[in-house]
Amino acid sequence: MPQNTRHTSIVEMLSTPPQLPNSTDLNSLSEQTDKNTEANKSDTESLHKSISKSSSSSSLSTLDNTEYSNNNGNSLSTLNSQNLLSVHRQEWQHTPLSNLVEQNKLIFIRGSISVEEAFNTLVKHQLTSLPVENFPGDMNCLTFDYNDLNAYLLLVLNRIKVSNDKITSDCQNGKSVPVGEIVKLTPKNPFYKLPETENLSTVIGILGSGVHRVAITNVEMTQIKGILSQRRLIKYLWENARSFPNLKPLLDSSLEELNIGVLNAARDKPTFKQSRVISIQGDEHLIMALHKMYVERISSIAVVDPQGNLIGNISVTDVKHVTRTSQYPLLHNTCRHFVSVILNLRGLETGKDSFPIFHVYPTSSLARTFAKLVATKSHRLWIVQPNDNQPTASSEKSSSPSPSTPPVTTLPSLASSYHSNTQSSRMANSPVLKSSDTSNNKINVNINLSGPSPSQPQSPSTAMPPPQSPSNCPASPTPAHFEKEYRTGKLIGVVSLTDILSVLARKQTHHKEIDPQMARKQRGHIG
């Protein structure tokens, strides 16, 4: 197979922080500031305050078509809000939360709407969570996310038990279930709220403890203006890293040096600052992976072979790929097969290698880890120890396939049904994970719980060929080739957004004793 036809990956291009816009203007501004410092310290402080004020008074959602100028006429060019690029002349810890507010992405749902309506809203707006209001202006919301959706699916499939018998009965008899009831079934952390005048030094103490998101309010704390998630904060810090020189020492450090992740396979238990490695065998059924994520209260799980080598990743958001009737047999197929399916769904564009790579090495730099988390939009990366005949951590920098953004999933309603057994008959009209239909916005869910029979032809949704090789070869590789290309070594650890934010908090803020496992301990897990 040709070795030099692979396209440059996005991850490779993100191995160093992206350039800020108009670096010439910024350098000029910096030089002018230095001159002012020598001439008049008070003038310099005034300039810094002016820039900081300009930055904090404008949320990222209103930066489009805006131009700022300092007192000396130096223009700070238009910034694109979608790139999360902003200009700062300060340390990252002092950045006000107002800089990260995206009011255009703040969408509430009522607790009285059905689970399927809530799911449709997630898909429509390409969000991963939604605040659920009990009444307009509710300041103590619970959030609806894909973990709740997974719990709902498992409840409908009679794979889990909850104390609310009515909810159980309604789910399994096809009745509409209010989303406000479903979000109560999954343990949640408190709904943290901070005013927009607070800074990142404050919020990182919360997000670094494992809380996934924080509500940003107005100064009076009477109105929610936006939601700041762990992933958005990581993206913001990465894309503005060149504006924060104090980040560089950490970004240049390796995961091993920072003691992030379980880096010793012989260790019985990770330390309190490290995340547990939770995996599932590739030959186990997908439904078992979804159940394990529910029990362990995690949002993704590693898929490994019998030797412990990493062969893939399944996220709780992938539950959206088992929503059509034709896709339900996937639940009873293997995790290994599902990995190939979701890679296909993420797509190959014009023969480019667009596979997201969810792994790093112990010697990978924090910058490299930042880049991959941003590029894959993932909450965690798996740490692997490469085999002797596989690429080293250093060679990974020039050989990683590029990640891609998954396409928006369209889930049309289904008009037909089949009732192959008692369970599927009971669930035939259950509105599980339904999608909007342009005609009637109704979903008819029909689940074949028996799984695909050996003689039954697979539907187009499930009978997807293995992904093509990155060399533009027209022939699809065999499963063995798929594993050879993308199995990266023995799974020895995991690094999450929480791990990284907790390190930033301990190293560069006053939160020296932060426990990255605190929020997860609060949520608990089912033994």
Curated annotation (Swiss-Prot):
SMART domains cross-referenced by the UniProt entry: CBS (SM00116)
UniProt cross-references to InterPro entries, sorted A to Z: AMPK_gamma/SDS23_families, CBS_dom, CBS_dom_sf, Ssd23
Example GO biological process: cellular response to glucose starvation
Composition skew (Low complexity), residue ranges: 52-61, 391-417, 450-462
Domain CBS: 101-162, 185-243, 272-330, 335-391
GO cellular component terms given for this protein: cytoplasm; nucleus
Subcellular locations according to the entry: Cytoplasm; Nucleus
Compositional bias segments (type: Basic and acidic residues): 32-48
Residues with Phosphoserine modification: S9, S42, S46, S430
Composition-biased stretches (Polar residues): 21-31, 418-449
Region ranges (Disordered): 1-75, 385-481
Role description: Involved in DNA replication and cell separation during budding.
Protein name (record): Protein SDS23
